[in-house]
A protein has these predicted regions:
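Catalytic beta/alpha-barrel core
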Residues: 2-16, 68
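Active-site loop/helix belt of alpha/beta enzymes
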Residues: 20-26, 31, 36-143
Length: 143
């Protein structure tokens, strides 16, 4: 992966120990996309503890991006987006560049757009489908 210049996902401290072993032996920094848990509870550094966790290893990685996932694009979207933006501010305060930022999937993109971030991760919308339910024709004409 090092030779191919692959960016790794990083969502917990255990991963960084493994990355450090490999990349330090090569004299390289591991390129990572930081995962931030803003409420989904599946994967990522907790949004409210991000600063203290990242500070322990920030100098050993190159952050190329920071992302999160919406638990529910409608019910908690604004709360999660605000948490994510707070996490991004925390990174900046400790001198870490968050890189490319992204959070919206297809359903979130339909309601929030890009959320003021750098990118979106549409999947089903790219194919002209919408996970929001049958009869939603807002995607017709996209393809």
């Amino acid at each position: 992966m090092c030779a191919q210049d692959i960016t790794m996902m990083l969502g917990n401290i255990a991963q960084i120990d493994a990355y450090k072993q490999v990349y330090a032996s090569l004299g390289q920094k591991c390129k990572v996309h930081l995962a931030v848990d803003t409420g989904m509870g599946r994967y990522g550094f907790s949004w409210d503890k991000l600063g203290e966790e990242i500070a322990t290893f920030a100098e050993t990685v190159e952050i190329t991006g920071t992302y999160s996932h919406f638990n529910n694009a409608e019910k908690m979207a604004h709360l999660q987006l605000n948490r994510f933006k707070q996490a991004l501010e925390t990174l900046k305060k400790i001198g870490a560049n968050p890189g490319m930022t992204h959070m919206s999937n297809s359903a979130a993109f339909m309601t929030l757009g890009d959320g003021g971030l750098d990118a979106v991760r549409i999947g089903s919308a790219f194919l002209g489908k919408c996970a929001r339910g049958a009869g939603d024709d807002r995607l017709s004409g996209w393809l």
